[in-house]
């Protein structure tokens, strides 16, 4: 059976762990003062990967909370992937040379496709493409803008350019605990023929089991945030649920 990975999410703003509702910077809840301590807790529960997002960076277009990412990547025996505020080759190299396993490129895929293609050629599988969609269309700039490009179109273009892994976020479900948009994630996996990690809306172990059912179709994992922070289930329970045979 195809593997399925749980990615606990740590969204950072002002050096704290926060969650936003549907990407709205005015709807923030703080869940912890230390991103690295949070990463340690997830590692202790068995995480193989941790998904870290620099929300300040996404908004400002530069690295802001990068020191926490580097510290987590180097102190813990887990793989760290990071997104937010990564706009230049220097940003990509900065993280990858300092122990971070993978870098997520999101908005840049629309605003600067040449750059993204070059990064895919240079770094291969260490580049993950984040596709964030609102009603099927790609959103950019920290979700503040919506483009006229369909998620599957962007996915196909970047798969041809060498992308092997996508993170698909359905903005309508993000931070809502309303259930993931499985259909849209599977559509992207089928359109690209590549691995898609689903993000947004996971609220229960059953949601994770439901996503896991599509592992053979290319759904390679799920990013889980709010459900962990609001104690819907623990990371240890999530890992157990998706590894049941």
Curated annotation (Swiss-Prot):
It is found in: Cytoplasm. The keyword DNA-binding does not apply. GO terms for molecular function: 1-(5-phosphoribosyl)-5-[(5-phosphoribosylamino)methylideneamino]imidazole-4-carboxamide isomerase activity. InterPro entries: Aldolase_TIM, His_biosynth, HisA_bact_arch, Isoase_HisA-like, Isoase_HisA-like_bact, RibuloseP-bd_barrel. The keyword NAD does not apply. Pathway: Amino-acid biosynthesis; L-histidine biosynthesis; L-histidine from 5-phospho-alpha-D-ribose 1-diphosphate: step 4/9. One of its GO terms (cellular component) is cytoplasm. Pfam families: His_biosynth. Keywords: Amino-acid biosynthesis, Cytoplasm, Histidine biosynthesis, Isomerase. It catalyses: 1-(5-phospho-beta-D-ribosyl)-5-[(5-phospho-beta-D-ribosylamino)methylideneamino]imidazole-4-carboxamide = 5-[(5-phospho-1-deoxy-D-ribulos-1-ylimino)methylamino]-1-(5-phospho-beta-D-ribosyl)imidazole-4-carboxamide. PANTHER family: 1-(5-PHOSPHORIBOSYL)-5-[(5-PHOSPHORIBOSYLAMINO)METHYLIDENEAMINO] IMIDAZOLE-4-CARBOXAMIDE ISOMERASE. Belongs to the HisA/HisF family. HAMAP family: HisA. This is 1-(5-phosphoribosyl)-5-[(5-phosphoribosylamino)methylideneamino] imidazole-4-carboxamide isomerase.
